[in-house]
């Protein structure tokens, strides 16, 4: 490692503007039209209600596109929007329609068009592992099985849909449930009402190709693939083959089609799934309450550890698929929120967001994360609470009621959006600045870490990201107090600072003073 000396100092930094810094979000360069995006995950049910029924809808998302774009996000992931029996809609009854609670196909067409007009790419959740027990495929298969005599064998020619699922006359484990009125059991790993599909069936493969063609024809830019590890339990080779075949079909229809897959596992297992040649996997190795981002934000690990793990992760994935696009995130709809993991500590919550948005790839922000929204306990409904637009409880301002079984009286730790927008020190404005810095410097997302400089103090780290002729240097300070880093040999200038108290890094005589809990962006002097 290259060696630079860092000296920890105790004085409070004076807010002097460094070279090129404005203290405002950076100017956005002309957008690079590729699949590196800043994604915003939306649970439509709880986001924005356009018609006053208490449930979020597609028109509500469309109304908030300017908000999402101004925040700095240029990609949106919609959690499932297809007809379903549940509030979360992961039990799909029809893959080629919109749940009536959310609107219509025409509403989706309008949303797609408005997203594209604002240079926002729209991806939707695709649940390929299972369907609803109310899906016509499953109903037809069960009706056929119930019609069989005790000694009569299944004939796929009589009912092709029997081949769409896993059926057996034996209850192979506790994830198998009896088909009422028959001698057969079906597999349903997640829930009895979500029977698992048989993805080795050529007919099922063709069904999903038709489904993909339907959505691509309407203008959808990609799919978030749900539960890919569970396509065939414990069979990575089969699962990656399914993913690869499906992805290749999608890009044959739309060459820039994007796919990001859920592989809830450690780094090495995620790397195995990159053998599929699909572009992105969610980086669960860095996420969650015990992930590297949260640990660094709350001081359980330091800057040196964070950047080392980050570089190791990038190298691990790149060895398998050199064209991979990492998909880092902090938490999602299945996890307790960042606010809970960091005990409502505002500085730590901000810093976690800053760390995320300094990482390579396409980061994903869970709606409300930019406000420091809170969840409660292990109940999933409490991880999917209404977006906090304002304190107005009249029901006339688009605020949703949230899932029926959620605890709607949760006291949030931070102000609603309308107040945070006006507060330059808010979590919202921190996130907005972090995103705008990222957009102004495409090399942050696209570059690779090629150098970690030795600065002698583990709480301080300096890295270089580079891509072709472009490069950026990023200095991390994970401690509460400010510090100095001698960088005379690098001929750098500060282009922006992201700090929890809005103070700025100052470069003087080859020594940079960086605030506590800060990320400083530098480039070579021209």
What are these regions (language model features)?
Residues 4-21:
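Sec-dependent N-terminal signal peptides of Gram-positive bacterial secreted proteins and lipoproteins
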Residues 19-209, 217, 224, 228-277:
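Acidic/aromatic-lined carbohydrate-recognition and catalytic surfaces
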Residues 75, 119-121, 221-223, 256-258, ...:
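Beta-sheet entry/capping signal
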Residues 133-170, 247-391:
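Conserved alpha/beta catalytic core and glycan-binding cleft of carbohydrate-active enzymes
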Residues 329-332, 341-484:
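Loop/helix patches that line or flank the sugar-binding groove of alpha-linked glycan CAZymes
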Residues 482-502:
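Beta-strand-rich binding/interaction modules
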Residues 507-526:
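C-terminal beta-strand-rich structural cap/linker in extracellular carbohydrate-active enzymes
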